[in-house]
């Protein structure tokens, strides 16, 4: 490595931090996914295999979303998007319903941006925590999110361009699921019909 290459790398890291894209580049390069693989291996060695596979968290989670019992509305009604209804059931690895589990859900708006980071949105828009009912069920109303890409003028996209890779993600929804005496689950789903459904920038 030459001194010029070394300082170019240092300057890149400075720009990455200034643009607050460190969490984006580690996800885009697969480093965060590698962390999941390490934790999966540790769980398997400890005899804790089974259940829904974990996926990456990503850099856009915000703690403290409003808590609801059984059901919630995620959107604030400002964004005229397509209405989305989703329901599910939380179960343990034996297939038994988990009452009182907390489903922490968040996603982007129709413009592909997230509340808190996009200050034009209301606080905790498209972010809620839902406590499952006696049968482990939860449900929510929201709007269909949009996919999005890395900022085109940012350091992450600059690196991806040099690697010959796009920076796009399909529309998706994030989940944290937790319950007493159970492992915390981080997962997400991609929405069917998106052109990047099977071509996402990020391995989840």
Language-model segments: what does each one mean?
Residues 1-201:
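Beta-strand-dominated extracellular/periplasmic modules and repeats
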């Amino acid at each position: 490595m030459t001194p010029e290459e070394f300082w170019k790398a240092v300057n890149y890291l400075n720009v990455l931090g200034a643009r607050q894209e460190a969490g984006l580049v580690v996800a885009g390069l697969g480093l965060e996914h590698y962390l999941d693989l390490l934790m999966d291996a540790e769980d398997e060695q400890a005899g804790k295999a089974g259940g829904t596979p974990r996926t990456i968290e990503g850099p856009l989670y915000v703690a403290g979303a409003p808590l609801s019992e059984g059901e919630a509305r995620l959107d604030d009604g400002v964004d005229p998007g397509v209405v989305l209804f989703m329901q599910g059931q939380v179960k343990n690895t034996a297939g038994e319903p988990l009452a009182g589990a907390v489903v922490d859900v968040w996603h982007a708006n129709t413009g592909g941006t997230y509340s808190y980071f996009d200050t034009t949105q209301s606080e905790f828009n498209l972010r809620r925590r839902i406590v499952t009912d006696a049968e482990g069920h939860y449900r929510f109303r929201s709007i269909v999110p949009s996919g999005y890409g890395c900022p085109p003028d940012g350091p992450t996209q600059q690196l991806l361009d040099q690697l010959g890779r796009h920076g796009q993600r399909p529309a998706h929804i994030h989940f944290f699921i937790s319950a007493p005496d159970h492992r915390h689950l981080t997962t997400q789903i991609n929405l069917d019909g998106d052109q990047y459904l099977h071509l996402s920038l990020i391995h989840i």
